[in-house]
C-alpha cells in the first residue's frame, strides 16, 4: 500500500513576512479553519511549526473572546464559515 502524498505547500505567514498574528484578524485565521471551525493540520495548511503554534494560540484566543464558535451544529455547516449571509 502506498503512502498518500500531499503537495508541497509553503507557509503563508513566512512568505508574507508577518511578525505577529492578531486574534482579531479573522481574514488571516480563516485559512487554517475547516468548514466546522476546526483547526486544520500543518500538512494541509503548509504552515511551519512555529507559525502553526502561533495560529493555534490566536484561534483559541478568538474562540475565548467569542469571535469564532467552539462548536458548530451539524445541520448548520456552511461552505465558507466567514461568508456573510
Curated annotation (Swiss-Prot):
Keywords of the record: Ribonucleoprotein, Ribosomal protein, RNA-binding, rRNA-binding
Task: Write out the GO biological process terms.
Answer: translation
Ribosomal protein found in the keyword field: yes
Q: GO molecular function of the protein, one example?
A: structural constituent of ribosome
Q: Which GO terms describe its cellular component?
A: cytosolic small ribosomal subunit
A Pfam match is Ribosomal_S18
**What does this chain do?**
Binds as a heterodimer with protein bS6 to the central domain of the 16S rRNA, where it helps stabilize the platform of the 30S subunit.
Q: Which NCBIfam families match?
A: S18
The name on file for this protein is Small ribosomal subunit protein bS18
**Which source organism does the UniProt entry give?**
Helicobacter acinonychis (strain Sheeba)
